[in-house]
Each structure stands twice: as structure tokens, then as C-alpha cells.
Amino acid sequence: MKLHTLVSCLHDFPVVPKENPEITSIEADSRKVKEGSLFVCMKGYTVDSHDFAKQAAAQGAAAIVAERPIDVDVPVVLVKNTFRSLAVLADYFYGQPTHKLHLIGITGTNGKTTTSHIMDEIMRAHGHKTGLIGTINMKIGDETFEVKNTTPDALTLQQTFSKMVEQGVDSTVMEVSSHALDLGRVHGCDYDVAVFTNLTQDHLDYHKTMEEYKHAKGLLFAQLGNSYNHNREKYAVLNSDDNVTEEYMRSTAATVVTYGIDTTSDIMAKNIVMTSGGTTFTLVTPYESVNVTMKLIGKFNVYNVLAATAAGLVSGVKLETIIAVIKDLAGVPGRFEVVDGGQNYTVIVDYAHTPDSLENVLKTAKQFAKGDVYCIVGCGGDRDRTKRPIMASVATKYATHAIYTSDNPRSEDPAAILDDMVHGASGKNYEMIIDRKEAIHHAIAKAKADDIIIIAGKGHETYQIIGKEVHHFDDREVAKEAITGRLNNEE
């Protein structure tokens, strides 16, 4: 593709050189540049790839996209924002693949992963070959890949969509992070359905204020409907019980469908009953009301199911198909996942890493707990410090015993993170154990019959970041090891 043809998709008045070389690939990593590449420079948090433009040119780059003039011997296209330009260029270069997909985007603080997995199952049951992009993994049909970010970088994203189309995928569900929206990674993505789960405190190390965080999430809905395929109706699926929904309603040009429990909505759940074995409720839709029994536990999972149900219905899936999927749902790795080693107490691993998600998990555990509730929780280093005392407060409020421990301390002193947390502790029902493995073993050693242990924060993650080192660490493995060790000692 010729350079002038490619950059014609940019609408922010780029400064385009006279030269018009052939472009054979797009790269954002100078180490991957080869003959014919278009190298896009981006200023990140720690590295500014404008500094590698000469290296890219030396490796054969045919042209460079930058935010400032660069002294190189190849054509330079100047744009205002290279992050957003990369997304639009990649979409155009790969043939605008999302035009050929039914694309469902899910955003919100909590519930994105579970909702996306439920939605993937619903679309499969409807006969689609599906794609899935999310926190845990990426799927193309039945093939699974590891991921680094909730939402991949723009180039990887469009390459993935292109691969999905090539392999016959016709419906894709993806988690859309606030970072991806703010940085413009999803510019060029033609969403058919956008789903909002909820908005609670998180990522304030990046967004600084809740107002900025709310605005970033809202971009998915503000941009929905202002897109390419005007012959396809767009839908915004919004949680009526969240107080930002009215603002998102006003910002979108799409058709709005609501779901909720406490507020009158298009899709509702009533008569909710929870036990340790699952949840039953009445699913109320504009078409009919149906009694539903599912294995998933917790009010938060009812919200996830309602969101997926609404998205499924606007995607043309029959209600009976959706109900059948809900009844068979087995859960998502690291989301209220029970670790069973034959013990007489319950151990649950959950990704809860925000005050709201931790409160939801602990409230759910208390609803069916016959004994004490333990909560093992930490807060990430180099991340939002303001939520540390709040997390600690939630743990001591809802758990019988709270254990504060490490959770990816990164460059910070783990003891200092725990000190920040302790400021929010109410009461004396907590202890601090810096070593996460020791904390898990300690709780499991103390647990009595019918107690519940919640190991919060990591969920599906299999690593612990200490300094710049990434160590293997899986809460589920450590818990199973501790359970087995205790059982062996008791024999």
C-alpha cells in the first residue's frame, strides 16, 4: 500500500511529505522494523520511541509517523497524536476487519472478564465462530493465546481482528480498559454493542480523579454510533443501578438497553436467592419472565449475567438459548474459584482488587458462611495509594479475620504498602504477613470446619512482581499445597 493511500485515513490534518513509498508493514517497536515498514513513534511513560527513529530508518523503514520533526533520510508524516494515529492506520492497513465482525465491547471497573466469557458462550451457542479478547486470555475459535494487557496495543489488536476474519470468526467479544480508551488504542474498532458493568474506584494512579476515570470509560459510548457501518444498529447496554449510567445515556447516539436489580430496567433480576451451591432468580425481560438457576454465586454474578443477557438479546440470540447457557455456566478462572483439596473448610481465590469488588466477594461469602471468614488481601506497588486504606477497611469490616500481605509490590517496600493499608483498618481483627505464601499457609493452618478463606487480588494471575523481577506465583497452587500439607499432617 502506498504511503499517501494509507495516511488518507487520518483525519487530524496530518502533515504529509511529497514522497510516496510503498508500505509493507506497520511497526511501533523499532526492533521489528524491516525494509518497507512504516514506523510509528510514540512517547510512553518511560520510553520515547521518537529517539529510535534513526535506528528504524537505518533498518529499512520506508517512512516514519511522528509528533515532532525528526532528522532522518526517509519521509516523515507529522500528526498530533501518534497513539490514536497508530490505531486508525492499523485498522486501515489490515482492511478494517471489525467491519466484518459483530463486535461487542465490555467496559467497567468490575465484571468485565466474567461478562465477556458468558457472552462468548452465548454467541457460540447461537452458532457463531467466536473471538475473545480479555484479561485472562485471547481466543480465536478454540485456539487460546496468552495476553499482556486487558486490551492489547492498537497494532496487535487490528492484527488479531484480521487473523480472526481470516479464520472465519464472525463474532468477537472484548474487554475494553479505560487505559485503552484514553490512549486511543481502540480507535478504528467498529463496535456493534457496548456494555457497561459498573464504575468504582480503580486506576487513579493513571487517571488521577474519578471524574477522569468516568470520562475515559464513557468514551466507548460517546463514540458508539458515530462509526462506519450506519446500516447496522448500535446498542449501548447500561447498568441502571450505577449512578453514571444517565450520563452515558446522554452521551451516546446508540439505542440504549438497560439492565438492573434495584432500578426498573429493560432486563431485571428479581427474587434472588443465594446458597453455597449457586443462585436462583427470576429473569424479567420485555418478552417473558423466567426462573433461572445457575452455579455462579453472588449478586455481582447476577449483574454479569444480566449484562450478558441484554447484550445477547440485542445481538439476535433467542432467550431460550441464553437461559440454557446460564444454567450450564461453570465460572471463570480466578473469579470466586473454589480450591478443593478435600478439606472441611472453603478456600476461594478471587481477582477482587478494588474496594467494591472486595466488598462484593466478602458480602457473598458471609451470606452462606457457617463459620468465620478470613480475607487475605494486598495492594499493588506503584499503583493507586489512595485505595490501600479503603481495601483494608473493607477487609476488617466484612471478614472475621483480615490478613494484609504482598500483591505485586514492584519497586515499593512491601512493609510500607502494608503500613498504608493499616491506616484504614477498623478494629483489631487483622494481622500483617508480608510474605504472601506464608499468609496463605497461615490462614489455612488456622481455619476450622465450615470457615471460608478468601484469597483476594490475583485471581487467575500466575506471578508476583518484586522489584523488576517477575516470579511465578499462583494463589491456587499455593492454597492447594497448604491444604494438602495440613491434611497430611492431620493423618
Swiss-Prot record:
**N6-carboxylysine: residues bearing it:** 217
Q: Record-annotated residues binding UDP-N-acetyl-alpha-D-muramoyl-L-alanyl-D-glutamate?
A: 30, 149-151, 177, 185
- Per its UniProt record, what InterPro entries does this chain match? Mur-like_cat_sf, Mur_ligase_C, Mur_ligase_C_dom_sf, Mur_ligase_cen, Mur_ligase_N, MurE/MurF_N, UDP-N-AcMur-Glu-dNH2Pim_ligase
Write down any Gene Ontology CC term.
Answer: cytoplasm
Q: How is it modified after translation?
A: Carboxylation is probably crucial for Mg(2+) binding and, consequently, for the gamma-phosphate positioning of ATP.
Q: Which cofactor does it need?
A: Mg(2+)
Q: Which UniProt keywords apply?
A: ATP-binding, Cell cycle, Cell division, Cell shape, Cell wall biogenesis/degradation, Cytoplasm, Ligase, Magnesium, Nucleotide-binding, Peptidoglycan synthesis
What's the superkingdom here?
Answer: Bacteria
Question: How does the record characterize pH dependence?
Answer: Optimum pH is 8.5.
Question: Does the record's keyword annotation contain Oxidoreductase?
Answer: no
**UniProt keyword Nucleotide-binding, yes or no:** yes
Residues bound to meso-2,6-diaminopimelate are: 383, 407-410, 457, 461
Q: Which Pfam families match?
A: Mur_ligase, Mur_ligase_C, Mur_ligase_M
Q: What exactly does this protein do?
A: Catalyzes the addition of meso-diaminopimelic acid to the nucleotide precursor UDP-N-acetylmuramoyl-L-alanyl-D-glutamate (UMAG) in the biosynthesis of bacterial cell-wall peptidoglycan.
Q: Which family does it belong to?
A: Belongs to the MurCDEF family. MurE subfamily.
The record's annotation in HAMAP family points to:
MurE
Name the chain's protein.
UDP-N-acetylmuramoyl-L-alanyl-D-glutamate--2,6-diaminopimelate ligase
